[in-house]
Amino acid sequence: MTDAENTKPELPKNVRVRFCPSPTGTPHVGMIRTALFNWAEARATGGTLIFRIEDTDAVRDSEESYNQILESLRWLGIDWDEGIDVGGPHGPYRQSERTAIYKDVAAKLLEAGYAYESFSTPEEIKERNLAAGRPAEFGYDGYDRNLTDEQKAAFRAEGRKPALRIKMPDEDIAFDDLIRGTIEFKAGSVPDYVIVRPNGDPLYTLTNPVDDAMMEVNVVLRGEDLLSSTPRQIVLYRYLMELGIAKEMPLFGHMPYVMGQGNKKLSKRDPESNLFNHRDNGFIREGLLNYLALLGWSIAPDRDVFSMDEMTEKFDVRDVKANPARFDIDKAISINAEHIRMLEPEDFLRRSVPYLHRDGVVSADNWDALTDREREVLTAAAPLVQPRVRLLGEVAGMVGSLLSTEGYLEPADDAKKQLKDSAGEVLDKAIAALEAVDEADWKTDNLHETLNKALVEEGGYKPRLAFGPVRVAMSGRRVSPPLFESMEIVGKPVSLARLKGLREHL
């Protein structure tokens, strides 16, 4: 395979793209990026996105995985125009329901001489390669191309059943990749390949191009790992066009690998690859989609944060970079934080509630089912917490102390380390000053003024040493919402109980 001059073709007028995952595991970020880029291209061009399922692997496919794929697309807001649950003129849209179609196409390819019966076993292919002085892994050698009827009959008499192979032409195969420019595969570099197993099961090498052809897909956007299969599909497309099954050759674009830590390809087994891990940690759809879009594409050289509406206005797959993209979880979290800050406060709270309920902080998993007090506290806390969290999973740690009516909160280990020798004396002075404040005056500004006077101006403590013990008493955490606002939300009785509780435990 060689890259020639950088030639990227024009897109067709009526773009038809597809997303066609196999239901063989939990949705991963590479799969979702593929869906995102296809969706963005369809929306940017006013084209059509087809969603179908490639479920012909009876051993690995599962209905659970199928449902997870649907769940992930719906959560992310990636919609489609034709296919699963939507219907359309080219159904069915699950390969397991299209077996008769594949058998019919395979029979036509065989009858036309584009495919042939192959009786060779893997062991025989390996032995022939070794005998000819070729590496054992050289691949299929074309042995069965010209078998006579007598030879075929003899194999059948032995009980052998043939696979079907496509005849690859003895010529260079080149195409203009939408992302990589012109790519050329030299003659002889791609052997004749199997499209139907001896047991009659059609393979991906047949089903995928046949579905694309019959669904009139004209732009194929997929991962770099499938680049090596493109010359096979180009040849098969030529044959399908000759047979009147395909209308045209689609354009191909191969998106770059997503790399993980240590510059290795991100594996499906890596936690960072698991889409639902990111959702469980508190990524919001806007933040995660924004970051996935950056794995190969950018809206502008000096801009990383954008909405999906902005993406679909600007996206062109020909702008995707061919170089591998590295999944940087820190950058992903940073971008997610930006999108959290852009949410309306009520939207932020409603999205946070399932995480709060999961972590045992509130009584229900949806906003409308919360108690009046929970809604009141969260509404007051939103402007304090929303600018400070990066993931919705962090909200519980920030608001738990505000929702709790406990008098003493056991400090976390990192919070305890912040307490200096002066903590006891600081708490004594703080308690004395705050006990003199009327509940009617228990307001943020007055609390700040009272403690600042007692601890900094009169006590002589630096602000960090003055307010640190009070913060630990109020939240039990090293990082918490703003102190005086928190004290106002919690109220005088609970605030004093917490200060006294920590003082007693020192």
Swiss-Prot record:
Pfam families per record: Anticodon_2, tRNA-synt_1c
GO BP term, example: glutamyl-tRNA aminoacylation
Sample GO molecular function, one term: glutamate-tRNA ligase activity
UniProt-listed Gene3D superfamilies: 1.10.10.350, Glutamate-tRNA synthetase, class I, anticodon-binding domain 1, Glutamyl-trna Synthetase, Domain 2, Glutamyl-tRNA Synthetase, Domain 3, HUPs
Family annotation (CDD domains): GluRS_core
The keyword ATP-binding is annotated on this UniProt entry: yes
UniProt-listed Enzyme Commission number(s): 6.1.1.17
Ligase in keyword set: yes
Catalysed conversion reaction: tRNA(Glu) + L-glutamate + ATP = L-glutamyl-tRNA(Glu) + AMP + diphosphate
SUPFAM superfamilies xref list: An anticodon-binding domain of class I aminoacyl-tRNA synthetases, Nucleotidylyl transferase
Binding site for ATP: 268
Quaternary state and interactors: Monomer.
Function: Catalyzes the attachment of glutamate to tRNA(Glu) in a two-step reaction: glutamate is first activated by ATP to form Glu-AMP and then transferred to the acceptor end of tRNA(Glu).
Protein name in UniProt: Glutamate--tRNA ligase
Annotated source species: Bifidobacterium longum (strain NCC 2705)
Source taxonomy: Bacteria, Bacillati, Actinomycetota, Actinomycetes, Bifidobacteriales
